[in-house]
Amino acid sequence: MNYADRIDHTLLKPEAVPEQIRNLCREAKEYGFHSVCVNSSYVPLCAEELKNSGIAVCSVVGFPLGAMSTRAKASEAAGAVLDGASEIDMVLHIGMVKSGNW
């Protein structure tokens, strides 16, 4: 059974450089992963690298803590979609969830 098409190949390190992101995309194409998941600043690069490959570009929003406003998360998500993301992984604001404000 092949599980590669269920994997989100991810690189979220703040020190990641463009060549590492390009390598992430190459690996996703080589192994047939479902998507690459990156910080929103790398969405345009991934969208270009993965054009016509069938591999989705996923952007994290509110990463890593989730402790930002809903407006800021919505803006980051909208920008990522405009830049080529077809999936969004949002980090919840744990304090708000714990207090029932979600």
Cite the ranges covered by each PLM segment.
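Generic N-terminal amphipathic, Lys/Arg-enriched alpha-helix
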Residues: 1-29
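Hydrophobic faces of well-ordered beta-strands that scaffold small-molecule active sites
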Residues: 3-11, 36-38, 56-62, 88-90
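Conserved, mostly hydrophobic/aromatic
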Residues: 8, 46, 80
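Active-site-adjacent beta->alpha loops and helix N-cap segments on the catalytic face
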Residues: 18-19, 37-56, 67-72, 95-102
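Generic structural signal for well-ordered alpha-helices
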Residues: 21, 25, 43-44, 77-78
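Short active-site oxyanion
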Residues: 29-36
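Glycine/small-residue-rich loop that forms an oxyanion/phosphate-binding "nest" at active or ligand-binding sites
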Residues: 57-99
